[in-house]
Amino acid sequence: GEIDGNTMQNIAFENNLSETAFINTAKENEIKFYSPTIEVDLCGHATLASAFIFFNFIDKNATDTIFKSNRGELKVIKKEESLVMSLPKDHPKKVDDIERISDALNCQVIEVFRGIDDFLAIVKDENIVETINPNIEKIAKLDSRGLIVSAKGVATEFTSRVFGPNVGVDEDPVTGSAHALLATYWGEVLNLKKMKARQASKRGGELICEVLENHVEITGKAKLYLQGEIYF
């Protein structure tokens, strides 16, 4: 049967992960995302995880699927061992917030942009991204879902970290949705369509991003970690 939003929120709170996704196959694969504290409109990695479950447990013959989210249709294609997710492009808009964002990150920021959900702070090099120790309380005062910090990469085209205390996640391990903004930005700066990206959280992760006319395709892999029943 269906479960209501309040129950979804309680389950996400108990799971205590960045986001928990809920798929309703009776409603044409409607998908909902909850952080431990709030419903969010889009979560890329929870979409990839949901697609993995869909292809391996719900429809084993399918090679693509569409999830209906608060942010519109999210298409995922199965390509051998990888999953390719299509997200709407998120165009960065330059904002004059360097001082406030530098203060929140405890480092010198070169430029600041705003996407649909997040602020994007560009710093001088990848080493700064890896070593910053931000002020989470100051980031929580920003009027955004999260704050992305990024620089040109060494082994990859760009590196990033994502902080989201406003949605109950001090630092997200890997953030698919942030790459709709990151890939759009770096694609223009580096004049590239296809890029390898690294998120430098403690757990870390690498993604392949391809910038198309209206969408960003993000390629990643998923593994089954846990299977069970929830009683509520």
Kindly give the residue locations of the regions a language model identified:
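Active-site proximal loop and beta-alpha junction motif in alpha/beta enzyme cores
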Residues: 1-42, 48-232
